[in-house]
Amino acid sequence: KQNYHIVDGIDKENPHMVEGKEVSVVYDDGRHYIRTLPKDRKFDIITSDPIDPWVKGCAALNTVEYYRMCRDHLKPGGVMSLWIPLYDSDIETIKSVIATFFQVFPNGMVFSNEINGKGFDAVLLGQVEPTVIDLDKLHEKINSQDYARGRESLMEVGYGADIANIAWRPNMWGDAEVALLATYAGRAADMTGWMKNAQINRDSNLRLQYLAGMSMGTHKETEILNGILKYYRFPDDIFIGSSGR
């Protein structure tokens, strides 16, 4: 019953994702589920939102082997996303998480969160194929009526125009996708220097469970993000579109 309440929450924040028969609740350990799936069971998106890395058991959801399982169940063009907290952590811990993810997704990217405090969280995105985001197509889609509720959700959490100004500034709807993509912080190819000497987390060593938790109560999230941003290069081969974009 509690899981269905979670689904209700997803529907509120991500409209159209859980309507009708599109959602089935599976009662299983996430890693066990993905490992025992038939090889031909593929997904457009696999999102991994494990608990904080210092919690017992979380290291097993951040290993090379686990990411490979997820990668092998992506459809062509499919995406895997991973949430990572930068708070209560240190550089070595975050290096381990990111470098491990990039071992499996060498085209991976980092998106930061600077809406409500710099560097508090980050999201990793990975595709098997090189990622290309057409800004013109994205703008057209996100400003269409079919995506109106999704666009509104983005704006409610700070991407685009102030929610209070929506009624009298409808032209600001288009800012949502720009604000979202502006959180791009880096990619694997540009971050090799930052990841130097990172400890790769594997099933055989679970290094993350020994690294995480050593910086509880500290506030190094801004320092960590600034370190990543030193290697920032604008990804003109990822973000494409007309000159006006």
At which residue positions do the language-model features occur?
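Soluble small-group transferase modules, centered on the S-adenosyl donor enzyme superfamily
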Residues: 5-23, 28-36, 40, 109-245
